[in-house]
C-alpha cells in the first residue's frame, strides 16, 4: 500500500486536491473579510471585483506552486500554503490601511476598475515575494 502513495500520479492528485480545497477555504475567508459578496458581484458583471478576486486566486495558486515545489510532504505544503495565505491577507489589510482617502472595498464594490486592477497587481505581485521566501 505504501507504493500507492509514492506513485507520482497519486502525489500530483493529492497535491492538486489539497491545494484546491485550501483555495476554496481561503476564498471563503476573503469573502468574510470583504464588505461585498464576491460571487454575487461577479455574477452582476462587476469587473473590479472579478479582477480583485482573480488576483487573490492567482496569488494563492502561486504560493501553493512554490510550496509544492519546495517541500516533500502534504503537511509541509499545507503549512507553508497557510502561512503564505496569511501573508497575503495581511497585505490586503495593509492596502486598505495605506489608502485612507477612500475605502478599498467600497471602491471595488462600486466597480472602480482602477482599484480592482491595483488590488489584482498587489495580490499577484506580493505572492511572488511570499513564494520566494517559501
Swiss-Prot record:
Pfam families: DUF350. Keywords: Cell membrane, Membrane, Transmembrane, Transmembrane helix. Its main location: membrane. It is a multi-pass membrane protein. The chain crosses the membrane at residues 10-30, 48-68, 78-98, 114-134. Belongs to the UPF0719 family. This is UPF0719 transmembrane protein YshE. It comes from Bacillus subtilis (strain 168).
Amino acid at each position: 500500500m505504501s507504493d500507492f502513495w509514492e506513485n507520482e500520479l497519486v502525489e500530483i492528485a493529492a497535491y492538486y486536491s489539497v491545494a484546491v480545497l485550501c483555495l476554496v477555504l481561503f476564498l471563503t475567508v476573503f469573502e468574510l473579510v470583504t464588505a461585498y459578496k464576491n460571487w454575487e458581484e461577479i455574477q452582476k458583471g462587476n469587473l473590479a471585483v472579478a479582477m480583485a478576486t482573480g488576483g487573490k486566486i492567482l496569488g494563492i495558486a502561486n504560493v501553493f506552486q512554490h510550496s509544492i515545489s519546495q517541500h516533500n510532504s502534504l503537511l509541509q505544503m499545507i503549512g507553508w500554503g497557510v502561512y503564505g495565505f496569511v501573508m497575503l491577507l495581511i497585505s490586503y489589510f495593509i492596502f486598505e490601511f495605506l489608502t485612507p482617502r477612500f475605502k478599498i472595498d467600497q471602491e471595488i464594490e462600486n466597480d472602480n476598475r482602477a482599484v480592482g486592477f491595483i488590488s489584482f497587481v498587489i495580490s499577484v505581485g506580493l505572492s511572488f515575494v511570499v513564494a520566494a521566501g517559501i
